[in-house]
Amino acid sequence: MAKVKIQGHASGTGVLTVTAPNTSTDRTITLPDATGTLLNSDGDGSSLTGIETVTKQATAPSSPSEGDQWFNTATSTVSGITTKSMAVYNGTAWKAMSKTGLTATGGTITTSGDYKIHTFTSSGTFAVTVAGTVEYLVIAGGGGGGVANGGGAGGGAGGYRNSTGSETSGGNSSTESTLSLATGNYTVTIGAGGAGNNHGGTSGSKGVQGSSSVFSSITSIGGGYGGGDADKPGGNGGSGGGAARNNTTEGNGTSGQGFNGGDSSGNNDGGGGGGAGASGTNGTTSPYRGGNGGTGLASSITGSSVTRAGGGGGGSESPTDDAGGIGGTGGGGKGGQAGSVGSTPTAGTVNTGSGGGASGDYNTGGSHNGKSGGSGIVIIRYEA
């Protein structure tokens, strides 16, 4: 049986009418602008090879080959491909075949690969001049650490909401849907970190809850305060604050944003604040240690992996060096301890939304104050 091979070049969109050698049926084939072998047909034209097919489904095709095409039917971003859009596999990753078309100003603007990134470390305006779809990372301010004579509690991390590719949001939640933005101005609010409590010379108390960060319809809730002598339970927030000495009521994190704080398990060492990636740990008595802050989460929305939103460490009554809880990865402040050896707690790192470290006692001056949480951040990106 003779084979029909169609070769050549069509400028623009061309139409070839082919009569197979053993049938009177004409086969009409529409060709794009291309050069070389486009497709092969058997003798009667009933079987064609060389035609690219598109897989339409809500998950990325498994075991793809270079050049495979996929249309994302999901209602959210999957493997970095926005909803209702086409992608091609380049041999290592799925890449969007079409751009969002969005253009905007505001914040500090950088580029990474196919993306333009707007980073806001202080409040401002995201001005959209051409409508389109964006991904975002919105982190609130972290909670302040508490003060207690024997172990204040660490502040919780600010709420962590993320729509970047296959990354996660706080509290072990799935990535959120992307945002479709019309032209116009969108206020970006960066939440401040909550203040740590001053010892006051005679009694200690809780820290201050962090402030929320807001972008468009997305609000991340400020981190919960760390408990203190006068107000021992931890505060609720994006991630919860820890409970102060001799108290087991830690603050709760918000679903989809962060984890709970730790408690003091009936001893004189405060619990750690919750982080975006894990709960704060409890204070312990054997040995005497403040609870560690919960770990933060890493995101590559800027093109590089950065961990943010760690919980603050709890304070300890022990004068032993480093008895204060460790701050959670991502910028959580270290907890302090009693006495003068390495006792000073530290603040949450700015623009990470991390919780502040707690004080171990309040009898020896201002260095034993609970420390403030870190301010939040908003990062927005779209295909350039």
Regions found by a protein language model. Name each.
Residues 28-30, 61-88, 116-121, 137, ...:
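Short hydrophobic/aromatic-rich beta-strand motifs
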